[in-house]
Design a protein with these regions (language model features):
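Globin-like tetrapyrrole-binding proteins
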Residues: 1-145
Length: 145
């Protein structure tokens, strides 16, 4: 789990995520697809083009920040997203790529406001959140046989 300081720092980013979340996730997808084109087939490009996917991710990141001290509250949403991830054949090895580009997008969009402390806290938080998704996806894959 996350220490109290990490939780405090992540929660402190909620206002920035409310204001800039969609820009962060739009930047994230653009950069990730440019730098890691091999990951593109795992994503619904129609949802990318319509803006639905960046918006959904922005809302998920915001919800994670708002509930970082009790991520269990997000389990119904996590389980729903895990089903979609399994439909798309997402694998655990993709999570580090996602995390790298998410942190880079936070830095790119927020600039100097994305301090090392904030990026470190979000790196730790992302690791915990990724593990929650990986476990949910493992259960979903197992239930499918």
């Amino acid at each position: 789990m996350l220490d109290a300081k990490t939780i405090e720092v992540v929660k402190s980013t909620v206002p920035a995520l409310r204001e800039h979340g969609l820009t962060i996730t739009t930047t994230f997808y653009k950069n990730m697809f440019e730098k890691n084109p091999e990951i593109k087939p795992f994503f619904n490009m129609a949802k990318q083009e319509s803006g639905a996917q960046p918006k959904a991710l922005a809302m998920t990141v915001l919800a994670a920040a708002e509930n970082i001290e009790n991520l269990g509250k997000l389990m119904p949403a996590v389980e729903k997203i895990a089903k979609v991830h399994c439909d798309c054949k997402v694998v655990p090895e993709q999570y580090p790529i996602i995390g790298k580009h998410l942190l880079e997008a936070i830095k790119e969009v927020l600039g100097d406001a994305a301090t090392d402390e904030i990026l470190d806290a979000w790196g730790k938080a992302y690791g915990v959140i990724a593990d929650i998704f990986i476990e949910a996806e493992k259960k979903e894959y197992a239930s499918r046989g």
